[in-house]
Each structure stands twice: as C-alpha cells, then as structure tokens.
C-alpha cells in the first residue's frame, strides 16, 4: 500500500485534506504520514538549510511514496510548504524522493479558470514543473471530486514518475513567509 503525505497550508484547506484522508481510508487506497504546523517547532534559526530539509524528510515525510500539495491562494508564500516540497524531492539515506501531485483548489480555479498562472505555485515547484526531466502530476479539486477513481490513477501515475523525475533543487530555501503570489 502506498504511503502518502498531504500538505495543506491553512485551516480553510483542512476540509479538502480530510476528504482525501477519508477517501483513502475508505477505499484502502493509501496510508498517510501526518503533520501539523507544531510538528515543525523543532526547527529554529540555528538550523542550516540542509538540516531543515533533512529533518523534514526524516521527521515529517518519513517513508512517503507520494506527496500531495493542495494549492490555494496563500500556498506559495508559506515557508513550510517550500520545505515539504524540497524534502519530497530529495533522496536521503533509505528515504527516497516522492512522486508529487499538485491539486489546485477551488479558490484558484474559480479565480483563474483553466489558465492558472504558475505564480500561484511555490518557486521550487514552479521551476520543477517547467523542467522536462521532472514529471509532476497536476489536477484540480473539482476533477478529483467529480471523477470516481481519478485520485487512484493520479497516485499510481505519481508513483511511476517518482523514479523518473530528476528534480532540480536550488539553494533558495524560503526562511520566512512572504507575500501572496510569487513574481518570477
């Protein structure tokens, strides 16, 4: 059974995360690794960038096969999302990189319809989606919600892609939260 980590920024998005968790549990589709913002309290300003990412990999993502990122209006501005993405992209000891699924939430699709700008994404994700050597799965919440079996297809696809993807991880780790959208 796949191990899945679901990243969401705010309490407003928790309902989407809970829906995915319930669906996964009911269908026996995946096991989850959980976290909340307090789980990141072990990190402090004395940690180096590498220590932060490795700690997130070891203590938060653990042995996840796939990471699902719920993308809302504030997601790109959050440092913890940046850390989770970077930790999802690295191999560290026996812990391998994760397949990545991006789910655009209704607050994004309602505003932008089908022409979602890359600026809604965290920078590290934007750069890797644009990289032909990376295979990141994208979908919308509406599609997952309407199409039975869509999530299972996405999980299987992301799992296949994880070993093919050559993520590029820059040194621009986010050390504090920033404004709403990235400007590249």
Predicted regions: what is each one?
Residues 89-98:
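Arginine/glycine-rich "motif VI" loop of SF2 helicases in the C-terminal RecA-like domain
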Residues 98-116:
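Short beta-alpha junction loops
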Residues 3, 48, 110-184:
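C-terminal interaction surface of TIR/SEFIR-family domains
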Residues 7, 69-73, 102-104:
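Conserved beta-strand segments of the P-loop GTPase G domain that flank and frequently precede/overlap
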Residues 16-18, 79-83, 111-115:
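A short acidic (Asp/Glu
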Residues 1-66, 163-184:
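Conserved N-terminal substructure of TIR/SEFIR domains
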Residues 74-90:
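Conserved TIR/SEFIR loop-to-helix hotspot centered on a Trp-containing motif
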Residues 11-15, 74-77, 108-110:
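Short acidic, S/G/P-rich loop/turn micro-motifs used as interaction or catalytic elements
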């Amino acid at each position: 059974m796949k191990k899945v980590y679901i990243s969401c920024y705010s309490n407003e998005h928790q309902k989407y995360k809970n829906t995915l968790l319930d669906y996964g549990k009911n269908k026996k589709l995946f096991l989850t690794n959980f976290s909340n913002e307090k789980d990141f309290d072990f990190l402090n300003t004395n940690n180096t960038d590498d220590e932060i990412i490795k700690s997130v990999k070891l203590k938060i993502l653990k042995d996840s096969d796939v990471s699902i990122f719920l993308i809302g209006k504030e997601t790109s501005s959050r440092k913890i999302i940046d850390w989770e993405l970077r930790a999802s992209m690295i191999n560290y000891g026996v812990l391998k990189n994760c397949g990545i699924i991006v789910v655009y939430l209704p607050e994004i699709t309602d505003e932008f319809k089908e022409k979602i700008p890359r600026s809604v994404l965290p920078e590290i994700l934007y750069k890797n989606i644009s990289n032909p050597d990376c295979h990141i799965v994208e979908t919308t919440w509406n599609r997952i919600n309407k199409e039975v079996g869509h999530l299972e297809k996405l999980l299987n696809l992301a799992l296949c892609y994880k070993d093919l993807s050559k993520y590029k991880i820059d040194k621009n780790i986010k050390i504090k939260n920033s404004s709403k959208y990235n400007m590249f």
